[in-house]
């Protein structure tokens, strides 16, 4: 049951992190009459622009986070980013607050060490070989054991920040410095991963609901420097490989528990499925579902956490392509007229108050009768958007 927003019987969601994904979650939640409060470290973040109200705090600050939760007394606390004091969330959960999907799932998936140890050491899922390092000497030793080339990432970061490929011993110190510069929250620890020459990688959006676990059609994607660049749905998979992917996704999401959508990232090599990462929230590659599915990943997430039924059916093949800034500008302007002419394509601008070089400022979404054409149109439209 939901009440009426801004009245005493309102059902309230507190969104921790107010980026473009959270913005869409709030829009969907408000369609069900939910009162939405957005939180982030800077004013006028995308989700704040559609929320009933917002707070600006450092979410890694335990006292500030506790204060805003106790002030708002939300029915659901919905994390959207990694830079959150998860120990405070665990404390608040023991005091009766509901963290989506659970506080433990949020903590485990906020750092790569927690989720990798869970996946490989506890659940026995196939992963890339990995080591952890806390200083440069440990990193050099880990690289020797894993072998070159290999991937280095901070154990806590987002959108590919701090990730690099070590192609020779001369890259080690540079990669270490880059990882340290982008690390969030947990010192300078890094994960060193085996470089896998996979055939392709997918995101398998996995919805845990009161009625069971449902899987969206696989989403193919391309990352550049660890950051989402384009995605498409459906990505073709043979039935046995898809079944393996779904089995792996169910195993990890069942262990994490709770309700909501999970973005499970997987590599596929021949007919083998290799676990990469999981996010207990909508996934950036899943923005394509805004045009391909009966219900977008954001509607599915909102419905699942509210205990409502979901539909994961796909309607059309489609694709997404990021719109990135090439300039540094406060309150940028966008020329979108030409981009809007591209057939069966939609432009979604996030409304971020500052454009930075390489920052994701929007996305182009396209549908067609085949994925190839949709990808071409999404890319064309994205490149026609002029940010000034």
Curated annotation (Swiss-Prot):
<comment type="pathway">
    <text>Purine metabolism; IMP biosynthesis via de novo pathway; N(2)-formyl-N(1)-(5-phospho-D-ribosyl)glycinamide from N(1)-(5-phospho-D-ribosyl)glycinamide (formate route): step 1/1.</text>
</comment>
<feature type="binding site">
    <location>
        <position position="284"/>
    </location>
    <ligand>
        <name>N(1)-(5-phospho-beta-D-ribosyl)glycinamide</name>
    </ligand>
</feature>
<dbReference type="GO" id="GO:0004644">
    <property type="term" value="F:phosphoribosylglycinamide formyltransferase activity"/>
</dbReference>
<dbReference type="InterPro" id="IPR011054">
    <property type="entry name" value="Rudment_hybrid_motif"/>
</dbReference>
<feature type="binding site">
    <location>
        <position position="277"/>
    </location>
    <ligand>
        <name>Mg(2+)</name>
    </ligand>
</feature>
<feature type="binding site">
    <location>
        <begin position="359"/>
        <end position="360"/>
    </location>
    <ligand>
        <name>N(1)-(5-phospho-beta-D-ribosyl)glycinamide</name>
    </ligand>
</feature>
<feature type="domain" description="ATP-grasp">
    <location>
        <begin position="117"/>
        <end position="306"/>
    </location>
</feature>
<keyword id="KW-0436">Ligase</keyword>
<feature type="binding site">
    <location>
        <begin position="20"/>
        <end position="21"/>
    </location>
    <ligand>
        <name>N(1)-(5-phospho-beta-D-ribosyl)glycinamide</name>
    </ligand>
</feature>
<dbReference type="InterPro" id="IPR013815">
    <property type="entry name" value="ATP_grasp_subdomain_1"/>
</dbReference>
<keyword id="KW-0658">Purine biosynthesis</keyword>
<dbReference type="GO" id="GO:0043815">
    <property type="term" value="F:phosphoribosylglycinamide formyltransferase 2 activity"/>
</dbReference>
<dbReference type="InterPro" id="IPR048740">
    <property type="entry name" value="PurT_C"/>
</dbReference>
<feature type="binding site">
    <location>
        <position position="352"/>
    </location>
    <ligand>
        <name>N(1)-(5-phospho-beta-D-ribosyl)glycinamide</name>
    </ligand>
</feature>
<comment type="function">
    <text>Involved in the de novo purine biosynthesis. Catalyzes the transfer of formate to 5-phospho-ribosyl-glycinamide (GAR), producing 5-phospho-ribosyl-N-formylglycinamide (FGAR). Formate is provided by PurU via hydrolysis of 10-formyl-tetrahydrofolate.</text>
</comment>
<dbReference type="Pfam" id="PF22660">
    <property type="entry name" value="RS_preATP-grasp-like"/>
</dbReference>
<feature type="binding site">
    <location>
        <begin position="193"/>
        <end position="196"/>
    </location>
    <ligand>
        <name>ATP</name>
    </ligand>
</feature>
<keyword id="KW-0479">Metal-binding</keyword>
<dbReference type="InterPro" id="IPR011761">
    <property type="entry name" value="ATP-grasp"/>
</dbReference>
<dbReference type="InterPro" id="IPR054350">
    <property type="entry name" value="PurT/PurK_preATP-grasp"/>
</dbReference>
<feature type="binding site">
    <location>
        <begin position="158"/>
        <end position="163"/>
    </location>
    <ligand>
        <name>ATP</name>
    </ligand>
</feature>
<dbReference type="InterPro" id="IPR003135">
    <property type="entry name" value="ATP-grasp_carboxylate-amine"/>
</dbReference>
<keyword id="KW-0547">Nucleotide-binding</keyword>
<dbReference type="InterPro" id="IPR016185">
    <property type="entry name" value="PreATP-grasp_dom_sf"/>
</dbReference>
<dbReference type="GO" id="GO:0005524">
    <property type="term" value="F:ATP binding"/>
</dbReference>
<dbReference type="GO" id="GO:0000287">
    <property type="term" value="F:magnesium ion binding"/>
</dbReference>
<dbReference type="InterPro" id="IPR005862">
    <property type="entry name" value="PurT"/>
</dbReference>
<feature type="binding site">
    <location>
        <position position="265"/>
    </location>
    <ligand>
        <name>Mg(2+)</name>
    </ligand>
</feature>
<dbReference type="Pfam" id="PF02222">
    <property type="entry name" value="ATP-grasp"/>
</dbReference>
<protein>
    <recommendedName>
        <fullName>Formate-dependent phosphoribosylglycinamide formyltransferase</fullName>
        <ecNumber>6.3.1.21</ecNumber>
    </recommendedName>
</protein>
<comment type="subunit">
    <text>Homodimer.</text>
</comment>
<dbReference type="Pfam" id="PF21244">
    <property type="entry name" value="PurT_C"/>
</dbReference>
<comment type="similarity">
    <text>Belongs to the PurK/PurT family.</text>
</comment>
<feature type="binding site">
    <location>
        <position position="112"/>
    </location>
    <ligand>
        <name>ATP</name>
    </ligand>
</feature>
<feature type="binding site">
    <location>
        <position position="80"/>
    </location>
    <ligand>
        <name>N(1)-(5-phospho-beta-D-ribosyl)glycinamide</name>
    </ligand>
</feature>
<dbReference type="GO" id="GO:0005829">
    <property type="term" value="C:cytosol"/>
</dbReference>
<feature type="binding site">
    <location>
        <position position="201"/>
    </location>
    <ligand>
        <name>ATP</name>
    </ligand>
</feature>
<feature type="binding site">
    <location>
        <position position="153"/>
    </location>
    <ligand>
        <name>ATP</name>
    </ligand>
</feature>
<keyword id="KW-0460">Magnesium</keyword>
<dbReference type="GO" id="GO:0006189">
    <property type="term" value="P:'de novo' IMP biosynthetic process"/>
</dbReference>
<keyword id="KW-0067">ATP-binding</keyword>
